[in-house]
Amino acid sequence: MNSKNLAVIGECMIELSQKGADLSRGFGGDTLNTAVYIARQVPQQELNVHYVTALGTDSFSREMLQAWQQEQVKTDLIQQLDNKLPGLYVIETDDTGERTFYYWRNDAAARYWLDSPQAESLCAQLARFDYLYLSGISVAILPPASRVKLLALLRQCRANGGKVIFDNNYRPRLWQSQDETQQAYRDILSCTDIAFLTLDDEDLLWGKQPVEQVVSRTRDFGVSEIVIKRGADSCLVFSADGETEDVPAVKLPKEKVIDTTAAGDSFSAGYLAVRLTGGNAVSAAQRGHLTASTVIQYRGTIIPREAMPQ
């Protein structure tokens, strides 16, 4: 059996986490979390998981690459730019556990992956992939000219028989205006096959509406499979054939929930680990819930490998 190829497009940043006088360093990024959790759950004989971004030539970038390779995430499509560095963010946690995030990413390498001399040949490769996955953040960090190139890539991939998967992860501070975001999302959703939505992000971007209207709007853009993630509640899957599935979440005692940072990213990973290897939507959603419910029982976005559900 020929293994299929999935490219996950986005940005991973250096994470500094401060609690009191202690400062710990790690790496974080919504799409990177998803890539790692898919790679952990699908054998390479079935699916190759590639990460697509740009990094620097510094020691932090090299450390990232090594960490991802150890997770069986392929890094051969990642560009290293001489004069750029990864973005950086700091998480400050107060005495009540409330977290504040500070970002330094305006000139991060990931913003320029479509501007390099290699970008054209890279896009030609990606256009032949079976699946391309990206999030609202993957789009938000790009300059306008790069967004045009990204759209062209998504359209070409679909024209070649590939599928596009989009997570609506909306961060208002990364965009110039709501109008700009709405237009960008319209463009992306018009060439998306599977969309992961959270109602909080939808409400923030389009205004509060019932689920039925959210689904109707997304369908009108041309999306055939819509997955609505609802945290600790059941998720809703709206299939291309008009079927709707309401799949219960895994219930956890409150004291077991430690860190929900990567809950949505890991849900998407579990869902796709099943869906992209031939499983049905209900099995995929069940796996998504199982993955997310495991991840939130640990601190940090990437849990120990041995803690993964079987």
Positions of predicted regions on the chain:
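Conserved phosphate-binding/catalytic region of the ribokinase-like
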Residues: 1-4, 156, 211-310
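Short beta-strands and strand-loop turn motifs
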Residues: 131-138, 164-171, 196-200
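Conserved N-terminal subdomain of the carbohydrate kinase-like
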Residues: 16, 46-136, 310
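Glycine-rich phosphate/adenosyl-contacting loop at the front of the ribokinase-like
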Residues: 1-74
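Active-site metal-binding loops of divalent metal-dependent hydrolases
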Residues: 12, 168, 266
